[in-house]
Amino acid sequence: MEKSMRIKVRLLLVLITALEKVPVLVKLFLRPIANAPVISGKMKVLIRAYMGATAFDIHDVDLRNGRIGIGGVEEIMAGSIIIKLLHEILAEKMGEEKKNKALYEIGINLCKWEVSQSLGQGRWAPRVLVPLIVNSKIIDEVQSDPLMARFFKKTMNMVSRLITDEGGWGHLDFDFSSMPLKVTLVNSQEARWLPGSRKPVCHFYAGIVAGYASAISGEDLEVKEVACKSMGTPNCVFHITRKSGSRQI
């Protein structure tokens, strides 16, 4: 990483860490600013989030046209039982193995689309942050550079808070020091709706992790669920690896 970029990363880490230490200050003073009618429309999603705004604060609601989105990424809302219905109906129509592959591919394509939309709209992160978050060296950098690993983890924690935690999917925790890279999902919706399984069931969410990791790195990465709450483990754990024939993570 270039020296100038390392300086920016250090400054951002200092600022983010300082805000994390004063949650009351953030809630009482910064969140009202982040949600102010005129100012909020000109601020990036991640900036507002670090200032205490929630996903519910940041969502754009178009009542006239019946649309909702966040940072230019259009969304729809549905009951969480849709996860169970997708598993059951696709299994009935396709069989278990093809269903699992289909859900994984849906997750990949969904998340790749969301990343492309968020970057294309330019509303999620300041331009100075985009090369730090989305680049072809990111996988190697987070494993070889402790500074970059700290920064990326904090950034991913915030993105996860907005999308996963406040979106009702559960809670993600990232371990960039492990080999391979490890992602832990607490309170998985798939595991909740499909309890008592002998095999991992979170194929859709594995695809989501793979889609996001592939989109920000520019690589085709694979994700495998190695522990699943549906099987009785405390949480669901995913490993991120490069496809066979390429460099391993």
Language model: regions and residue ranges:
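Active-site helix/loop of acyl-thioester processing domains in fatty-acid/polyketide metabolism
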Residues: 203-218
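Flexible helix-coil linker/hinge segments at domain or subdomain boundaries
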Residues: 217-219, 248-249
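Low-complexity, intrinsically disordered Gly/Pro/Thr-rich segments
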Residues: 219-228
